[in-house]
Amino acid sequence: LNVNTYLIKNINVIPMHKDTVLANKTIFVHNGIIKNIESKIIVDDIEIIDGKNQFISPGLIDMHTHLWDKQELGLYLANGVTTIRNLWGYSMHLRLKDKLQKNKIIGPMLFTSSPKLTSKDDFGDDKVQIETKEEAKKLVIDYKQRGFDFIKIYAGINEDIYKTIINQSKKSGISIIAHPSREIPYLDQFNSQVASLEHTEEIVQQALNYEIDSLKLPPIIQKFVDSKKSFCPTITGFYKIYEMLDKGEEVINNGAINYMNPLIKTVDSKVQYNRWANEKTNNSSITETIYKQHLFHLYILKKMNEKGVNIISGTDSGIGITVPGASIHQELSFYKEAGLSNYDALKTATINPTKTHKEFEQMGSIQKGKFANFIVTKKNPLVNLNELKKPEWIMVNGRKVDKTTLNKYSQNAKNRNNLVVTALRYLEYLLVER
């Protein structure tokens, strides 16, 4: 029997390319691809999965992650995430991608950006500082040749380097993901080579110059509409600042933090917590200020959705206290809170990413010719998105993973002790990329 070939019978299909439920269908999966969806399909000598009249929807896509180890791949699967876009890439991610593609390990489909590119005055070892246009060109060519899927540009990139990267990316045929730059007017960052702009807080902090002013929003939202740019809100990543301020040290000592990579937990989580704890000491109103900005982020999202902007769900997971996997459910709940319907919220993590990159076209919906990336739940997630938190089983690239195995992946990630290995990989990044 082919492990990636099945008939899934007696299942209710949530296709996601339209707002409907196809009751009591059979799905024929062959070599990891959906071949047919009908009321009745007969295929000889094939493994049959009884869908038990449950609900099958496309696997979730997290469009803004920071991946540190194999255990996080398991955490994503355990939460129904079958595709991730890693946005701080280096050699390790290319190796993981290769292993996933050769089925040596199981995990979500992995797409990774290059290292984060910025200009020479934007300090920090997490970024590659570019001094000359020649250097910028060479890096884009090199990243494409090495197998990175996208170029990631960062907040300190100046206009000259930005234009050089844009031009070389066009020539090299590689799209760009933009953390908007502080050095360039926000509305000038919608180049056709840019596939998506990240982070709602950058609209407030850059485009609006920290003013929570709804009257200044329309031209910004219209720019997204006119340019057909995808927008990745990362509401959860910003909200974690409020959680740190509101809940105190508890958030870096107990609970969800135990699923973070130990190097991040030891260094980044503490650094971020201390930064905001110090801010609170000096500014008693900071908690309220951050919460007000969070609510404004939800308002921005509501207005974007009303205008038909292509919103793609991304969490900023893997840094600070934003946990890989589980954060997608918090992100979707924020979209719901912002006023999106369950269907519109779920679109952001399924069908909408397919409009962002050509590499994603075979995902995001349950249709003929698409990858067999599924979540199966007892009840209908279009009635309650929380159903997605508890998959009965999932399928990734046609490989079925049952509930027991998913639970094991979560347990394997909890309080893991790979700090030294992660530190060595980070050292490799510093030596190779910088």
Please name every model-derived segment.
Residues 13-26, 39, 323, 341-346, ...:
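Acidic, glycine-enriched loop/beta-strand segments at the rims
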